[in-house]
Amino acid sequence: MANFTFGDLALDVARMGGLASTPSGLRSTGLTTPGLSPTGLVTSDFNDSYGLTGQFINGSHSSRSRDNASANDTSATNMTDDRYWSLTVYSHEHLVLTSVILGLFVLCCIIGNCFVIAAVMLERSLHNVANYLILSLAVADLMVAVLVMPLSVVSEISKVWFLHSEVCDMWISVDVLCCTASILHLVAIAMDRYWAVTSIDYIRRRSARRILLMIMVVWIVALFISIPPLFGWRDPNNDPDKTGTCIISQDKGYTIFSTVGAFYLPMLVMMIIYIRIWLVARSRIRKDKFQMTKARLKTEETTLVASPKTEYSVVSDCNGCNSPDSTTEKKKRRAPFKSYGCSPRPERKKNRAKKLPENANGVNSNSSSSERLKQIQIETAEAFANGCAEEASIAMLERQCNNGKKISSNDTPYSRTREKLELKRERKAARTLAIITGAFLICWLPFFIIALIGPFVDPEGIPPFARSFVLWLGYFNSLLNPIIYTIFSPEFRSAFQKILFGKYRRGHR
């Protein structure tokens, strides 16, 4: 503040550095600190998030009057103009470690989002309207890292807001603006993906104008949520010049408005959209699988006839499916087809498959079914011994037994591979959506729970460490976004590799 003395600031710095934690330590620095009573030294941690005054020893309090009032003036009438100071005395190692960790965090966030922006601008394959949303998201997260996080680091280390209240108001508004814009961009991306999945014509109709309109709406809504405290919608008791802390407005009405608009409503929309995307993707994958199976069955019917008047049969023996007391039943399946000019040997009118060996349970094994399939293919091929190019192939044999069981020998390597691929696609879609929604909820849900209940509960019930942790956990989402929304794209991965190895040169893109 403008009325700080050098001794005041030196005292704060000394306490932060662990140089002076007792009155004797202060005297050893040779600094005089007007307005500080030795018996009124603060001993408790500073409640950095909500401006709580510390506890005082010997029953007296220390104060710095903004109008340079006398140090002996401790009357209650001046307490509203006093600024209470209470700094947690950390060791030098603790401060250095905290500074390094948070500094690296901010640096990684800046680098990650700069990579995304550079990739979209430099890589030709990424020059499409769908990536405009990714680009705008990276800009919002970069603003969080550049404009918001550095002051958060300073506040986290010092535990005191040293700047003017006007700077605090602007910083809080920018914080809410950028974080809200980042969250709303995730909703816009989810909507774009949902329309692309459910609407056949959306990809064709998705123009730059449409995407830019979505981006504009995102920033306007974020601005609408962030600026009300600048126009008076705030808690009048939350003055940084009095409390020594800079926090978002604790007005109950604004708290509900901002948390619902910035998180809870977007979260609900995202959850609904991604659940529907997953259902549509799963339905489409299974539908494609069914259509492929149906088409394959049509082309792989058991058909062994060389001319319209000549028929061949495949006999399927069901002895193995019945219990030992059951009667043996044989069923024949006939399916005529044309011979394409071939004449089979008259003596091969009927082709009978040999009975399959049975396992201990009386049911034929899969390996036996495969052997039987090969045997029938050989026999039917021999039926065209006059040199016909068409080779009959039996790819599907079913045995319907008395007990209602159906055994299929359609266990070819091709079908197994296709089933594995379809299952892999479905699992990948579910995993991708789970990562996106899970990261969003893990990062932001704890912060907004505390932010919503904060004005309605006793502030002492929420530890300052918990407030700091959930705040930086929310900031962590700005570091994860450039990873989550690009790592699944081969184009982005290729662009990142080119950037890392300096393959982008002037005139070569």
From Swiss-Prot:
<feature type="topological domain" description="Extracellular">
    <location>
        <begin position="1"/>
        <end position="99"/>
    </location>
</feature>
<dbReference type="GO" id="GO:0071880">
    <property type="term" value="P:adenylate cyclase-activating adrenergic receptor signaling pathway"/>
</dbReference>
<feature type="glycosylation site" description="N-linked (GlcNAc...) asparagine">
    <location>
        <position position="72"/>
    </location>
</feature>
<keyword id="KW-0807">Transducer</keyword>
<feature type="region of interest" description="Disordered">
    <location>
        <begin position="323"/>
        <end position="372"/>
    </location>
</feature>
<feature type="topological domain" description="Extracellular">
    <location>
        <begin position="457"/>
        <end position="465"/>
    </location>
</feature>
<feature type="glycosylation site" description="N-linked (GlcNAc...) asparagine">
    <location>
        <position position="47"/>
    </location>
</feature>
<feature type="topological domain" description="Cytoplasmic">
    <location>
        <begin position="123"/>
        <end position="132"/>
    </location>
</feature>
<dbReference type="GO" id="GO:0005886">
    <property type="term" value="C:plasma membrane"/>
</dbReference>
<feature type="glycosylation site" description="N-linked (GlcNAc...) asparagine">
    <location>
        <position position="3"/>
    </location>
</feature>
<feature type="transmembrane region" description="Helical; Name=5">
    <location>
        <begin position="260"/>
        <end position="281"/>
    </location>
</feature>
<keyword id="KW-0812">Transmembrane</keyword>
<feature type="transmembrane region" description="Helical; Name=3">
    <location>
        <begin position="170"/>
        <end position="191"/>
    </location>
</feature>
<feature type="glycosylation site" description="N-linked (GlcNAc...) asparagine">
    <location>
        <position position="58"/>
    </location>
</feature>
<feature type="topological domain" description="Cytoplasmic">
    <location>
        <begin position="489"/>
        <end position="509"/>
    </location>
</feature>
<feature type="transmembrane region" description="Helical; Name=4">
    <location>
        <begin position="211"/>
        <end position="233"/>
    </location>
</feature>
<keyword id="KW-1003">Cell membrane</keyword>
<feature type="transmembrane region" description="Helical; Name=2">
    <location>
        <begin position="133"/>
        <end position="154"/>
    </location>
</feature>
<feature type="transmembrane region" description="Helical; Name=1">
    <location>
        <begin position="100"/>
        <end position="122"/>
    </location>
</feature>
<feature type="topological domain" description="Extracellular">
    <location>
        <begin position="155"/>
        <end position="169"/>
    </location>
</feature>
<feature type="glycosylation site" description="N-linked (GlcNAc...) asparagine">
    <location>
        <position position="78"/>
    </location>
</feature>
<keyword id="KW-0472">Membrane</keyword>
<keyword id="KW-1015">Disulfide bond</keyword>
<feature type="glycosylation site" description="N-linked (GlcNAc...) asparagine">
    <location>
        <position position="68"/>
    </location>
</feature>
<comment type="similarity">
    <text>Belongs to the G-protein coupled receptor 1 family.</text>
</comment>
<comment type="function">
    <text>This is a receptor for 5-hydroxytryptamine (serotonin), a biogenic hormone that function as a neurotransmitter, a hormone, and a mitogen.</text>
</comment>
<dbReference type="GO" id="GO:0004930">
    <property type="term" value="F:G protein-coupled receptor activity"/>
</dbReference>
<protein>
    <recommendedName>
        <fullName>5-hydroxytryptamine receptor</fullName>
    </recommendedName>
</protein>
<keyword id="KW-0675">Receptor</keyword>
<dbReference type="Pfam" id="PF00001">
    <property type="entry name" value="7tm_1"/>
</dbReference>
<feature type="disulfide bond">
    <location>
        <begin position="168"/>
        <end position="246"/>
    </location>
</feature>
<keyword id="KW-0297">G-protein coupled receptor</keyword>
<dbReference type="GO" id="GO:0043410">
    <property type="term" value="P:positive regulation of MAPK cascade"/>
</dbReference>
<feature type="topological domain" description="Extracellular">
    <location>
        <begin position="234"/>
        <end position="259"/>
    </location>
</feature>
<dbReference type="InterPro" id="IPR017452">
    <property type="entry name" value="GPCR_Rhodpsn_7TM"/>
</dbReference>
<feature type="transmembrane region" description="Helical; Name=7">
    <location>
        <begin position="466"/>
        <end position="488"/>
    </location>
</feature>
<feature type="topological domain" description="Cytoplasmic">
    <location>
        <begin position="282"/>
        <end position="432"/>
    </location>
</feature>
<feature type="transmembrane region" description="Helical; Name=6">
    <location>
        <begin position="433"/>
        <end position="456"/>
    </location>
</feature>
<feature type="topological domain" description="Cytoplasmic">
    <location>
        <begin position="192"/>
        <end position="210"/>
    </location>
</feature>
<keyword id="KW-1133">Transmembrane helix</keyword>
<dbReference type="InterPro" id="IPR000276">
    <property type="entry name" value="GPCR_Rhodpsn"/>
</dbReference>
<keyword id="KW-0325">Glycoprotein</keyword>
